[in-house]
Each structure stands twice: as structure tokens, then as C-alpha cells.
């Protein structure tokens, strides 16, 4: 690998910062400590700093020269509601809160790149987006709705995530869908309760809800093109509390994922049609509440071509995978992808414990690798 020597020299200093963030994890939109630390460091490095963008988001801006070119680099800051089970000397000090997805590493790598870039000559504007609440709370959307790109516009935006694939390659990137969309649905099947001995005097919600559970599983197998990818997963089905009482309501909670917008739209249409048909056939009411967790993380071809050249320079072409099979997991960087030309990459964490696990450990070697990637992207574009 051909990492930036000055960044490698700063590795030890920023490992301590990463461990400090790891010890003090914060859930989405509660990243007060982390945001304050980020803002403090950026000010020390000479950036203009803007806080409370999307509640707890932070933006650092550094402009040099007279070019109108603008590049955005993004990192997420939030932790997960997990009790850490590692034996790390810097393990979480908070009960049931842990950096189990490596966002402490993402944040620190961007800070490391920020320090290095502040000492370099470039021509244009560097925007650093430190995003809150990636874990299902829509932090990217909150920043956008708070005027992120009106105030701090970028021609391209780049991000990355550590990924413990356990493979030989160090860097993964592809054109098109990198990660799936994620939509959550909460469905209420509303009947009329009654005594278990007299179902004819009630409107049992459990039977139509059971039909609904089965019918929803047919969406992918019977409607989605087999060459496309979609997942419908029912995670909760609840009704009643007693053996002799027909309840008023049954509830279903599920997630729906897709790798393209057409399939995503198709699954949504089928959900509503199935619910409508079952409601009519059983003379009950069905209410649907949909929440958009994340759009498809759709990489832009131009951005991928540019980032691929940077990755090959840094990691060597043999260590890069550009024909990567997309993940069905989601990432709210997808909201950025809907607005700007973006490229989202994975860096191998070299650890066999997967994300969102209480024993997960971020590999500190990635700090210099990711910071070098961030820095090369900026310097190559703003040359």
C-alpha cells in the first residue's frame, strides 16, 4: 500500500482520539460529546466550523485558492444500543451503549484527514460532513433538510464504511447500487374484540393478519424479477393476551429492502394492494404506517471512476474489488446519493466479528488507510 507518510506519522495521536470517542459512545441525535470534540479539533486545525446542522451534525469548511470546485467528505458519529462485551482497555463507559459499527473510527479517520489537509496546498473548497444518527434515525436526511447543500454545497461527496468481510481485498467499490434501500412498515389489522366462544359476534383480526403474513411473503417470490434483489422480512406479529378473548387489533412490523427504485416501488404497491384486498374480504380495517429508513445507496459512475483511481494509487489494484456484490443492508448515505454525485466504499476491517455485535472491534489500521483515501480524493480533485 502507498499510504501518505505524514498521515502514518499521525496514526498514534489519532488512535488515542478514536479510543476517547469509543469510551464515550452516544446514540443518534445525542452525540453532544462527540460533536463538541469534533468541532474543537476542526477549529484547532484552522477550519470554519458550523455546529447543530441536523441537530447534532458538524460541518468543517476550508477554502484555499480561487477555484469554484467543491468536494464533500462524510463520516457518521453515532453508536448503538448494545452492552459492550470486549476486554478493551478503552471499552465503553456507558451501559448499553457501544460503538459496534465503527463510527468512532469513521469520525476519527476524517479528523485525521482534516489535520493533514489543513497543511496542504489545494485550490477549491473542502467540506467535511460529520453526520449524526445514521443508525436508522435519518441523520443524513436531517442535515439535508437543515440546508446542508444550500449552505455547504459540494460537486461530489465521498464516504466509506469499515466491513469485516474476512477477505483478501482491502477496498471495495462499484458503480450503481452499493447498498439496499430500507423501508419499515407498521401495519394495524383492526377488527372488533369479543368472547372466544362467539367469533361470529366479533371481527377477529388474527385470521386476516395471518393471511397477510403469508401473502406478504409472495411479493418477492411471485412479483419481483428473479434477477433483481428484494427482501421482505416480518420481524414482529402481535395480537391479544388471553386464551379466551378475541382481540381488537393485531399488529405486524416488517422491513422491506431493494437494490433499485423500480423494485422498491413495486414492493410498496403490492403491500398496499394486498392489505386492501384482505381488509375488504374480511370486513376489517387495515392501517399502514411507512417509514423511509434509507434510500438505495446508489453510487454515481463519475464519482466511482474518480474514487477508483485514487484507491488503486493507494492500495494497489490487486487489493481492490470493483465488481463487488451489493449488500442488502442499508445506509442513510443514500439520502446524499439522491442529491449529489456520490461514491460510497468499503474498507476491509480484517476482523471476523461482524458489525452490530457486542464483541466487535474496529481495526485501528484503518485510520491511516481511510484518512489517506479521504485526503487523496480531496487533493486530486482540488489540484
Can you annotate each of these PLM segments?
Residues 21, 60, 73, 103, ...:
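Divalent metal-coordination and catalytic microenvironments
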Residues 10-13, 17, 30-41, 69, ...:
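General structural feature for long, well-ordered alpha-helical segments within catalytic domains
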Residues 50, 127-129, 287:
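A structural signal for isolated positions on well-ordered beta-strands in alpha/beta enzyme cores
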Residues 1-99, 104, 108-123:
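Acidic/His- and Gly-rich active-site-bordering loop/insert found
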Residues 210-383:
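Metal-dependent amide/peptide-bond hydrolase catalytic core
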Residues 59, 80-82, 87-98, 105-108, ...:
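Histidine/acidic-residue-rich, glycine-tolerant segments that coordinate divalent metal ions
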Residues 72-74, 83, 185-187, 344-349:
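Non-cysteine beta-strand/loop elements that form the S-adenosyl-L-methionine
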Amino acid at each position: 500500500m502507498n499510504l501518505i507518510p505524514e498521515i502514518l506519522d499521525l496514526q498514534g495521536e489519532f488512535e488515542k482520539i478514536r479510543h476517547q470517542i469509543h469510551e464515550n459512545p452516544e446514540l443518534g441525535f445525542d452525540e453532544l460529546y462527540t460533536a463538541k470534540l469534533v468541532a474543537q479539533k476542526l477549529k484547532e486545525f484552522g477550519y470554519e466550523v458550523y455546529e447543530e446542522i441536523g441537530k447534532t451534525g458538524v460541518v468543517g469548511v476550508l477554502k484555499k485558492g480561487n477555484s469554484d470546485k467543491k468536494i464533500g467528505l462524510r463520516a457518521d458519529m453515532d453508536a448503538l444500543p448494545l452492552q459492550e462485551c470486549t476486554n478493551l482497555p478503552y471499552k465503553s463507559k456507558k451501559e448499553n451503549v457501544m460503538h459496534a459499527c465503527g463510527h468512532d473510527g469513521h469520525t476519527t479517520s476524517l479528523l485525521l484527514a482534516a489535520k493533514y489537509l489543513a497543511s496542504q496546498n489545494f485550490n477549491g473548497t473542502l467540506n467535511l460532513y460529520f453526520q449524526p444518527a445514521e443508525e436508522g434515525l435519518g441523520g443524513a436526511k436531517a442535515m439535508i433538510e437543515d440546508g446542508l447543500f444550500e449552505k455547504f454545497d459540494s460537486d461530489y461527496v465521498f464516504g466509506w464504511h469499515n466491513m469485516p468481510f474476512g477477505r483478501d481485498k482491502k477496498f471495495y467499490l462499484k458503480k450503481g447500487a452499493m447498498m439496499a434501500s430500507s423501508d419499515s412498515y407498521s401495519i394495524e389489522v383492526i377488527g372488533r374484540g369479543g368472547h372466544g366462544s362467539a367469533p361470529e359476534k366479533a371481527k377477529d383480526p388474527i385470521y386476516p393478519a395471518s393471511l397477510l403474513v403469508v401473502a406478504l411473503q409472495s411479493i418477492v417470490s411471485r412479483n419481483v424479477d428473479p434477477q433483481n434483489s428484494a427482501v421482505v422480512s416480518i420481524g414482529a406479529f402481535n395480537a391479544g393476551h388471553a386464551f379466551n378473548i378475541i382481540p381488537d387489533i393485531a399488529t405486524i412490523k416488517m422491513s422491506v429492502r431493494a437494490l433499485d427504485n423500480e423494485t422498491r416501488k413495486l414492493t410498496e404497491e403490492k403491500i398496499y394492494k394486498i392489505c386492501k384486498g384482505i381488509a375488504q374480504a374480511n370486513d376489517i380495517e387495515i392501517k399502514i404506517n411507512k417509514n423511509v429508513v434509507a434510500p438505495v445507496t446508489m453510487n454515481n459512475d463519475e464519482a466511482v471512476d474518480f474514487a477508483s483511481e485514487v484507491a488503486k494509487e493507494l492500495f494497489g489494484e490487486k487489493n481492490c474489488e470493483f465488481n463487488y456484490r451489493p449488500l442488502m443492508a442499508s445506509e442513510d448515505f443514500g439520502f446524499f446519493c439522491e442529491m449529489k454525485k456520490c461514491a460510497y466504499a468499503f474498507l476491509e476491517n480484517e476482523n471476523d466479528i461482524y458489525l452490530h455485535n457486542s464483541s466487535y472491534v474496529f481495526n485501528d489500521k484503518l485510520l491511516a488507510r481511510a484518512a489517506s483515501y479521504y485526503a487523496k480524493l480531496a487533493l486530486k480533485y482540488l489540484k
